[in-house]
Amino acid sequence: MLYTKHINLTDATETTMFTVPTGFHIIIYYVFIANHAGSTKTASLHFAESDGSNRVDIFDAENVSGGGRLTLDSGGGPMFVLHEGEVVKAQTEASSDMEFVVTFDLLEMPPSLVNFV
């Protein structure tokens, strides 16, 4: 089943959007970031293991103009697979009004894959 997680950030605090639940993995299909502020602000989005290791930066302090948007998709196919316990985090800068949206499929892990990761 597809889910969309949405957060709105207004300060520079790194915020966890979601953590992949135990026994599941997710396939990310779409990422959308919108800057609702009047001036250019930076946006960062990454995923990593719960302890912060194996971090992958999707957007790393990417400039988004006032009223601008960033999108990342693969034409409807999967982009990233995350496993149980991995987290997706977003961050912007102070005095921002930045919207982060991630659409993903949440799938139960088959018993044969539980020890694979």
Where is each model-derived feature located?
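Beta-strand-rich interaction surfaces with strong enrichment in secreted/lumenal proteins
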Residues: 4-7, 59-62, 77-79, 89
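Short beta-strand segments
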Residues: 16, 41, 56-57, 70, ...
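Short, surface-exposed beta-strand/strand-loop-strand elements in extracellular ectodomains
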Residues: 38-61
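Beta-sandwich interaction modules
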Residues: 67-85
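Extracellular carbohydrate recognition and processing domains
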Residues: 7-13, 63-73
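Short conserved beta-strand and strand-loop elements enriched in small hydrophobics
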Residues: 46, 88-91
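C-terminal interaction-tip segments
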Residues: 1-26, 30, 36, 84, ...
